[in-house]
Amino acid sequence: MTSLRVAFAGTPEFARAALARIHAAGHDVPLVLTQPDRPAGRGMKLQASPVKQLALDLGVPVAQPMSLRLDGKYPAEAAAAQAALLAAQIDVMVVAAYGLILPAWVLELPRLGCLNIHASLLPRWRGAAPIHRAIEAGDTQTGITLMQMDQGLDTGAMLLTAVEPIGPADTTASLHDRLAVLGAELVLQALDAAAAGTLQPVVQPLEGVTYAHKIDKREAPIDWSLPAAVIERRVRAFDPFPGATFSLGGDTLKLWSAQVVDLPAGHGHAAGEVISTEGGTPLVACGEGALALTQLQRAGGKRLSGRDYLQARPVVVGVRAG
């Protein structure tokens, strides 16, 4: 293996796994770029990103500019980051869920370019929330694409891909963790190939482009008029954030797990109606079919099975979930 000088740009837990593998593999990481510390938790105290926390543990210098645009709102911070990158004399930059747009001067600086770890099989699910949207859409597989970055939104040439199945019980949390590991493995292959000069970029096809728009908290409320299968996928897609929310018997709840139940044609139940509690699980009619609510959480409480919830908060058949 040829050791490269690798700048790393990333912020969340997804990116942390890649930084750890790059460093452990023996590549020299002279600089890490990550988002500025943000308020988090109940006390809203400033908290470092997972990538920053790891970089500090590894003794790697960290830069946290608000922007990298030299002509933007924070030109001094961008100029300082530019100086740090130039001084680092990097061969390549690896980018994973960084959260800032990379202007042309960044893309052109490393001799081997900027490699992006994207959590989908491009060109499907370009954009900010590819894991969530793949589950929500009912995709049976997704994966990782290693991409040579350009100035478009996830439009660069594909370098390497790896496929990951999506299981019927997968949530964004479970799929995220597997893809983070897969991305870390794939980026090491890409760095070895880049050092050897054997990477073969493939232009993304024009067909099959979809966009994974950023998840909005306003998507959380459950629309019971939708088919049960659609709602069930959204429940898994929105775990852990923002959660699928609804109201029942005066409680504000998050639904973390549900099972689709077929109903006969002409059943006569309204969407959102609790039609049974037999077997210890609330069964709610949807626009098509019904959902057995198998794991719920009251505001401020812990996650409970449907049975445990009913024991604590009995539900009358016929009431409507909001």
Swiss-Prot record:
Q: Which GO terms describe its molecular function?
A: methionyl-tRNA formyltransferase activity
State which Enzyme Commission number(s) the record gives: 2.1.2.9
- This protein's record includes keyword Transferase: yes
| Keywords, comma-separated and alphabetical | Protein biosynthesis, Transferase
Q: Which reaction does it catalyse?
A: L-methionyl-tRNA(fMet) + (6R)-10-formyltetrahydrofolate = N-formyl-L-methionyl-tRNA(fMet) + (6S)-5,6,7,8-tetrahydrofolate + H(+)
Q: Which domain of life is it from?
A: Bacteria
Q: Binding positions for (6S)-5,6,7,8-tetrahydrofolate?
A: S120, L121, L122, P123
Keyword Transferase, does the record have it? yes
InterPro entries, per this entry? Fmt, Formyl_trans_C, Formyl_transf_N, Formyl_transf_N_sf, Formyl_transferase-like_C_sf, Met-tRNA-FMT_C, Met-tRNA-FMT_N
Name of the top EC class for this enzyme: transferase
Residue span of the signal peptide, if any? none
A Pfam family name for this chain?
A: Formyl_trans_N
* Gene Ontology cellular-component annotations: cytosol
| Function as written in the Swiss-Prot or TrEMBL entry | Attaches a formyl group to the free amino group of methionyl-tRNA(fMet). The formyl group appears to play a dual role in the initiator identity of N-formylmethionyl-tRNA by promoting its recognition by IF2 and preventing the misappropriation of this tRNA by the elongation apparatus.
Q: Which family does it belong to?
A: Belongs to the Fmt family.
Q: Which HAMAP family match?
A: Formyl_trans (MF_00182)
Q: Which PANTHER family match?
A: METHIONYL-TRNA FORMYLTRANSFERASE, METHIONYL-TRNA FORMYLTRANSFERASE, MITOCHONDRIAL
Q: What is the protein's given name?
A: Methionyl-tRNA formyltransferase
Name its species: Leptothrix cholodnii (strain ATCC 51168 / LMG 8142 / SP-6) (Leptothrix discophora (strain SP-6))
